[in-house]
């Protein structure tokens, strides 16, 4: 059986936490930050856990991620 390929775009965006959950960055933090409040920008720094329904798709895209 051939090796499974990793989706490089997904590998750059997701990782697995210590508890085994997929984690990602939040959107809207890259540019046009002047009009966003400090509180909003501070909260956007935090990571976000991916919804359970997307776990199967991510496991397919990232077969060797531990």
Swiss-Prot record:
User: Which cellular compartments is it found in?
Assistant: Plastid, Chloroplast
Q: Which family, according to UniProt?
A: Belongs to the bacterial ribosomal protein bL35 family.
Record keywords, A-Z: Chloroplast, Plastid, Ribonucleoprotein, Ribosomal protein
Domain of life where this protein originates: Eukaryota
GO CC terms: chloroplast; large ribosomal subunit
Identification of the protein by name: Large ribosomal subunit protein bL35c
Question: Mind listing the GO molecular function terms for this protein?
Answer: structural constituent of ribosome
Q: Which InterPro entries match?
A: Ribosomal_bL35, Ribosomal_bL35-like, Ribosomal_bL35_CS, Ribosomal_bL35_sf
Any GO BP annotation: translation
Coiled coil segments of this chain: none
Q: Name one Pfam family in it.
A: Ribosomal_L35p
């Amino acid at each position: 059986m051939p090796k499974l390929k990793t989706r490089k775009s997904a590998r750059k965006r997701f990782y697995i936490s210590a508890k085994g959950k997929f984690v990602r960055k939040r959107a809207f933090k890259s540019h046009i930050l002047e009009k966003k409040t400090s509180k909003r920008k501070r909260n956007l720094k935090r990571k976000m856990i991916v919804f359970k329904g997307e776990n199967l798709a991510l496991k397919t895209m990232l077969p060797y991620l531990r």
